Design a protein with these regions (language model features):
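Hydrophobic core
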Residues: 15-21
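Mature, structured domains of secreted/extracytosolic soluble proteins
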Residues: 5-10, 22-219
Length: 219
């Protein structure tokens, strides 16, 4: 696997550029505030490896790594800088398994998703396509927590970092059932997994796990 920490550092540097730090005032002893946690750090928390858990985010992690390795200046690098406020809707490994099956007719495993084969199929789509799909899952600006998403009017649009819109659909607010409309009207709408609400809450970057991949065009 690629060295994640090196790629994260490269992506953050590309995003931030050169930063000049002012010298502290003599005698000042104020403790430094901890740096906010980025979603890149959260994605790395369970390791940079494929595994047998189809409901975590290994394929997404590898997709981010692949884009940053080939395109360090990509807007995807925002995920490595915890100070950039954003909301990401992150598909789990099963979601990518479904996408690859829909696109190719080939389903790699079932009860045990063959994550590396699924990722290789995703990678075969090309860097620019992967980048476009990733950015379609990111909304820049103040983080949108689950309570906020659950409370908006049905059909509220959100403009993504890719430039296209997704639509928030609170289906049954008392139970926080929230779907997301994308640009593929012929397939199931992704929905937010209730157990994966508000990942990294309390930081400028927040994520919600989703059960299908958002599609920026009609497949």
């Amino acid at each position: 696997m690629r060295t994640w920490k090196k790629l994260v550092a490269t992506g953050a540097a590309a995003l931030l550029g050169t930063v000049t730090v002012a010298a502290p005032v003599a005698g000042a002893q104020e403790p430094e505030a901890p740096a906010p946690t980025s979603l890149a750090e959260v994605l790395l928390a369970d390791g940079d490896e494929f595994d047998r858990n189809a409901y975590d985010f290994d394929i997404l992690t590898q997709a981010v790594l692949t884009v940053l390795a080939e395109k360090p200046d990509s807007p995807v690098a925002a995920l490595t800088d915890g100070s950039v406020p954003l909301t990401a809707f992150i598909p789990n490994d099963r979601a990518f398994w479904t996408l690859v099956g829909d696109l190719t007719g080939q389903y790699y495993g079932f009860f045990k998703v063959q994550e590396e084969k699924v990722f290789n199929a995703v990678a075969s789509l090309g860097i620019d396509t992967i980048e476009t799909v990733l950015l379609y899952h990111v909304v820049l600006g103040d983080p949108i927590d689950s309570d906020t998403a659950n409370g908006v009017p049905f059909g509220t649009p959100l403009t993504t970092a890719q430039g296209g819109d997704i639509v928030v659909k609170p289906i049954f607010p008392p139970f926080k059932w929230i779907a997301l409309g994308d640009n593929d009207p012929n397939d199931f709408d992704p929905f937010i997994i209730p157990s994966k609400f508000d990942i990294n809450k309390g930081n400028p970057q927040i994520a919600h796990g989703i059960a299908f991949v958002l599609r920026p065009l009609d497949l």
